[in-house]
């Protein structure tokens, strides 16, 4: 029972000062970031070199001339998660992002798995990006043989291992920049992001000129705008959705933002909007230059310009790809130390990772550890086969953020904070309740489901049962979303079983959604966390649709990816059982209301005097 209880204990949030409460005080990160910094982080982390390749592959195999629509639909889908992140990041502006929100709203067990999955995401993501830089860099200098010998790829004799010194060196350079300070590293990211955006603008402007000159030949086809049908366009949307992953990095930097309530939602939203516009305009131009079936799947943009006699554009486009990869690499190295620091502050990881350098005010130990691990992977391993694992961490985090938003709106945790151990012994009369006596998110609904008001014929849910109904409804919608996603993706299932799963899943989803729409949201949401920030619209519909999309993408990642992820998650469970659970800052935590804490502090101050 003790182990199960530890999985559902939740970190409390002190609404009075906007910080997650633990038993210990930690060094804070520098409040140095403003709105332009967040735009640089968001756009730089999102627009990787994938756009220089994806447009060819998706247009040839799925979308055809409707490629821009695929990017638009994928952008709208990503925006659903962005709305959820925008509200929670402005409510709880602290390091940790999805891990932090899950710990406050759902529980320690889920938060640990989210944090553990994000560690995997950023490490493998950074290594994958770094391995992709050297081939593009070599193309700028004239080919693979033109890089200096010390940086060129080599195969270890007798082993099927190709080492990439250039990738490791670049990881160490980026790690060094991140150690200098968040403002310095963000400035550097802004420079390379700006260079990449200028290359994309060149593609749009020069490509549009060529398209008007040649008559947009890519759209004058007998197959029409949807050669693969609407299904092909939607399949293309699912593929290019992963080109929008990266805006969540902005939320990871929340503790270092000067005005988080205003700048975080703007940074997340405008970054995603800019990326969507750039993706769509590049897609429109490239499809107009070359018919979709004639696109080069490996180098679609440079090949499109070469087919019109502009050979030199290939060098500029390769430079843009290198800039995009460098910016994405920094977008992988920056957030992970903040995740490690947040988990170490909560006692789930060793305190080594919570150390913040006093001069640079960055989590230096976590940054160095992240850089070393990513450099080793990038040097020795071809991690391209592990790239799907990055998507698992991201999509699970997106899903839990949407669930956390539903909990914040409908089942707000009690306004309590942990009582410092120094005050526990002399203040037993003031102590409210321990973590063991906290009401669970789900519970048995009492027989007196409604309270009768004075007006005849009017009935309302009492507060206690409203919370329980909301908790069960959230769970029903999650189960329904999973069943629908699984049934829609399992083409090998017998038809009757598949349709039955769809029916049951749809029923669960519909019942949960109707209940959430009909009952009132929790009034305590207005004072939970920072108030006055961004408010996500269309709740509960928006987060529920967000959960459905993310679960569908998760189910379709493939069995091999899930096997690899399961091994990593199993290792995480072992670490949690033998270290995190025992060293958590919530072990034996005693909670009191915020008002009682102030009274206890005053009483203790008088007694000391």
UniProtKB/Swiss-Prot annotation:
Its main location: mitochondrion. Gene3D superfamilies: Amino acid/polyamine transporter I (1.20.1740.10). It comes from the Eukaryota. Residues 1-14 form a transit peptide. GO terms for biological process: amino acid transport. One of its GO terms (cellular component) is mitochondrial membrane. Signal peptide: none annotated. Pfam families: AA_permease_2, AA_permease_C. The chain crosses the membrane at residues 38-58, 66-86, 104-124, 161-181, 190-210, 226-246, 270-290, 314-334, 361-381, 388-408, 474-494, 499-519, 534-554, 558-578. Keywords: Amino-acid transport, Membrane, Mitochondrion, Transit peptide, Transmembrane, Transmembrane helix, Transport. It is found in: Mitochondrion membrane. GO terms for molecular function: transmembrane transporter activity. It is a multi-pass membrane protein. Expressed in roots, stems, flowers, and leaves. Belongs to the amino acid-polyamine-organocation (APC) superfamily. Cationic amino acid transporter (CAT) (TC 2.A.3.3) family. Permease involved in the transport of the cationic neutral or acidic amino acids. This is Cationic amino acid transporter 3, mitochondrial. It comes from Arabidopsis thaliana.
